[in-house]
Amino acid sequence: RNALSLSVETLAMSVLATAMAGVAVLLTFLPAARNLGNGELGGAPSRLWTVLYYLVRATFTLTRAIPELVWALIIIFFLSPGILPGALALGLHNYGVLGKLSAEVVENLDPRPTRALRAAGSSNFQMLFYGIIPQALPQFLTYMLYRWEVVIRTTVVVGFVSAGGLGREFRLSLSFFHYSEVALIIFWYLILVVGVDLLSAWLRRLARFD
């Protein structure tokens, strides 16, 4: 197959994996912050929040403890080879990593803004959207972009188990001793990595300015 189309496929896999992990973390990382359940940020302590804390934290630990390659080997039994199994494998592992990092961002927040909101009579919803998310979102975006840089490098690993992209073609070329194709794939892979690194750095600067 054309190296350019494989590069686009690899890039799509990395973007899909990062997006899936990011969306899943946005929906679940708040219960994984201990200070939200014990009232340190101004809210009332909640037993339900404590139970959610342990459940979500356990999920983060499980998903990041299993390497991307193992996730890919499991998923490939249920799905046809292609970028979707690779994206799911990468997304699951990075969900655990990004989730832990994001929860720790909330745990390290300055509690004074949320306490001031609570003292002014704000609801939990208002505390969340005016006190917690504005503080945590820039750091979350920074971590997500960093993980994208890691994901684009790991696509070649999951590709070895027929998860699509440059990784799969790299394995096939090595198996048939097509070293000229191997060199071409490495060249395109380096272009992808450098391009994603540069784009990620630019987007991180935008996130910090905001």
Label each region the model flagged:
Residues 4, 8, 48-55, 59, ...:
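Alpha-helical membrane-protein architecture signal
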Residues 5, 9, 53-64, 104-119, ...:
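Short amphipathic alpha-helical coupling elements at transmembrane boundaries
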Residues 74-77, 81-132, 138-147, 198-201:
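Membrane-cytosol interface at the C-terminal ends of specific transmembrane alpha-helices
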Residues 77, 151-189, 208-210:
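Glycine-rich helix-loop "coupling/hinge" segments at transmembrane-helix boundaries
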Residues 142, 183-210:
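C-terminal transmembrane helix and the adjacent membrane-cytosol boundary/short C-terminal tail
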